[in-house]
């Protein structure tokens, strides 16, 4: 679902922008601090209700304003959506889809599936399991309509159980939570396992194309020993969990691990190889969504040039072009875009950003 128009007001240093966008490639050029990454951040915020750079909303609102407003038009064939989000310094958030209030962030996220490739994205590979669970759960959110409610209820029950661990004296008092928690944990973990298994050949095939010198393997770990009953694990671990004050084992500990030639990728790959692998994983997942759901996936790419050799950059640019996806790419200069092997076409758009102002 490509964005055809984007309006930004008071988002970081972007005070007032109105962009007509290409459904193909949108190149955003500007020096460091000009606002080009903020433009990507604004698009990300529209699709997630949060920033990929800061969790403090007041840092995102322009220093002279009391709120920021983002508005976009989404086109898909004969269908069109108008979406908007307003965030105030007070913390209040207003969402609108086609002019109607009462929507949730998940409704916006459903309309705007997007993959983000930034220098910070290496945490997918060298960070903790939290980042890899988020990777899996992104795919599940867009793949299965029932996943989000199961996942949200699971988080709620885990939070309630952890609070109850500080209050109960015996396991009998906790068992009502555990009965429902165990059922949801099994459902969510099975969905994760099924999705991971379906995505695995796509990842391995795409890795073979970009990294033929390496044998990349992936494996899913559900967060407790496979083949064991989670309800029994909760019961057996009650005293330990009560002493620690939180639930130590379960789907909140799940992981999706990547290995190169049998070893953890973070131990054997160079930063350039890790950067390429991260790009490949995002690309494979986005392409899988398109193939399964016949929905377009947006790609937001910041600082693409760093740590990738020219051949790999050209391969990735060509693959993204072939995908038919809407892509947003930042660069410091237009010459840098040429060095990155991005080839402009007549359908592409090039934007120059300078001190929060933009020209096309």
From Swiss-Prot:
GO molecular function: ATP binding; single-stranded DNA binding
Positions that bind ATP: 30-37
Gene Ontology CC entries for this record: cytoplasm
Subcellular location: Cytoplasm
UniProt keyword annotations, A-Z: ATP-binding, Cytoplasm, DNA damage, DNA repair, DNA replication, DNA-binding, Nucleotide-binding, SOS response
Pfam families: SMC_N
Keyword Phosphoprotein attached: no
Keyword Transcription applies: no
Coiled coil: none
Signal peptide: none
BP GO annotations: DNA replication; DNA synthesis involved in DNA repair; double-strand break repair; SOS response
Entry similarity comment: Belongs to the RecF family.
Function: The RecF protein is involved in DNA metabolism; it is required for DNA replication and normal SOS inducibility. RecF binds preferentially to single-stranded, linear DNA. It also seems to bind ATP.
Official protein name in the record: DNA replication and repair protein RecF
Originating species: Actinobacillus pleuropneumoniae serotype 5b (strain L20)
Gene field: recF
